[in-house]
């Protein structure tokens, strides 16, 4: 499978693991955590890592990240496009990073770039753990969900299914 790294509408295809490592570091550093004066999130609020089969038109597995390097936290969201053979079990859900010991403040990690929505603080993990998740996803080259952290089902907009205020 081919690794794609997308940010700000630009998709790159690292040719080696060294290139991927450099792009991962650049992506984490370049993510913009803030809001614009209009209340919208600027470009670069997320980075998408995905895998695509040669000759395919759509990626088959995704890892989206939001991070704030200044405060040292980020969020990972993983899902597949449910094309066979990835059907059933974990493949039927979107998964959000879960931190059993979340920060005692809201790190305001962007969950939806079109609205002022943020991830739940319990989804925020320290940046070294986030980087390990990204590296695991990219190194395996299968698109499988990384196993180095805990996950909870949720939505692309950051809503967690384990919260009482989750609305289907």
Residue ranges and their predicted role:
Residues 35-85:
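Amphipathic, interaction-prone secondary-structure segments
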């Amino acid at each position: 499978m081919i690794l794609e790294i997308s940010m700000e509408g630009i998709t790159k295809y690292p040719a080696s693991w060294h290139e991927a490592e450099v792009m991962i570091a650049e992506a984490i550093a370049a993510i913009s955590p803030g809001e614009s004066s209009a209340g919208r999130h600027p470009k670069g609020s997320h980075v998408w890592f995905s895998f695509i089969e040669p000759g395919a038109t759509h990626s088959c597995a995704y890892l989206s990240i939001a991070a704030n390097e200044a405060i040292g936290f980020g969020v990972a969201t993983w899902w597949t496009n449910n094309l066979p053979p990835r059907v059933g079990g974990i493949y039927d859900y979107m998964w959000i990073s879960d931190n059993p010991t979340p920060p005692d403040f809201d790190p305001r990690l962007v969950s939806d770039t079109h609205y002022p929505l943020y991830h739940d603080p319990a989804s925020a993990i320290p940046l070294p753990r986030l980087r390990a998740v990204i590296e695991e996803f990219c190194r395996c080259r299968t698109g499988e969900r990384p196993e180095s952290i805990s996950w909870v089902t949720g939505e692309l907009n950051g809503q967690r299914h384990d919260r009482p205020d989750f609305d289907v």
